[in-house]
Every structure is written in structure tokens, then in C-alpha cells.
Amino acid sequence: ILRTRTDAVSAATCTRAGARPFSAECRPVEPITQEACMFFEDHAFFDDEEVQVQSVEAGQRIADALGDNRAIVLRSHGLLTVGAGVPEAVGGFVQLERVCEAHLKAREAKPLSPEAARFAKQDLERLNAHRGAFFSMVDRHVGDRTAVL
């Protein structure tokens, strides 16, 4: 992925409780929460049955499906995010996992309009929300930002 996406310095993936069941539903995230708007028109869905990625070829298929997006939902597997650095990739991953949980809990949620989702996304990007989420976690769990950078 990092070879294909030269703008990405870091990638984050992990199998979490909210991500795996959501990924098994085989659908993209929708802008149903403020956090979800950050991924509006900026994530992909990898519809492949090779859930145990064991080859360079499978990794390349994921990279191709990811395209220029910052995140991808991997069918029946979980999530993957990329970023300009560790804070963006990890912060984005945690936020996307929360978005997946919201989708599982709010089954009848009505998505925001594309215009509202784009506006929220632009504002959150201006605030560097993924980076902020990462440093909030570091401050809470580690305390020393220099220990993780």
C-alpha cells in the first residue's frame, strides 16, 4: 500500500469489535454522524473473499481498491487507514472504527445530505481532526507525546 500510495507515510489496521461485524455487512459507511462525515467520499470498500491477506498480490489489490482514499473497509475483515503520518493514520482508524460502531447501533439512521456531509468534512479537516484524535488518545493513555513520535 505504501509503495502504491507515495503520499501516505503510515497505514493502520486492526481487528476491532465494531469493525469486523460492520465489514461483514458489505457496505460503505454513510454520513450518519459528525465523525462519519470525515470519510464521506474518502473511503472505499474492498469486496474480496481473501480475508487472510497472505500475498503481495492481495496487498496490491487492496492498494488498488483504496485508490486515493484515506480509508478502506475490508470485506469480512476490518478496516485500514492511511495518513501523512502515524497520527493521521491511527487517529483516522480509531475514528472510522467508532463510525462503524455507530452504524451497527443506529440501524435506521438517516444520512446527512451530501452538502452537509461535505461542509462538516471540510471543517473537520481544517481542524486536523484525525491528528487531534490521535494526540487525545496519547495524552490520555501515555501522557508523554514524545514517547510515541
Regions found by a protein language model. Name each.
Residues 1-19, 56, 60-62, 68:
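Short HxH-centered metal-ligating active-site micro-motif
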Residues 21, 34, 38, 42, ...:
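Alpha-helical context
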Residues 40-94:
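A contiguous pocket-lining binding segment that forms or flanks enzyme active sites
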Residues 1, 50-62, 111-123:
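Noncatalytic linker/hinge segments flanking ATPase motor cores
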Residues 1-11, 29-45, 137-143:
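Charged, low-complexity, helix/coiled-coil-prone segments
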Residues 70-149:
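A conserved C-terminal secondary-structure "cap"
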Residues 3, 27, 64-67, 95-98:
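Short, intrinsically disordered, mixed-charge
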Residues 14-54, 58:
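Class I SAM-dependent methyltransferase SAM-binding "motif I" and its flanking Rossmann-like core
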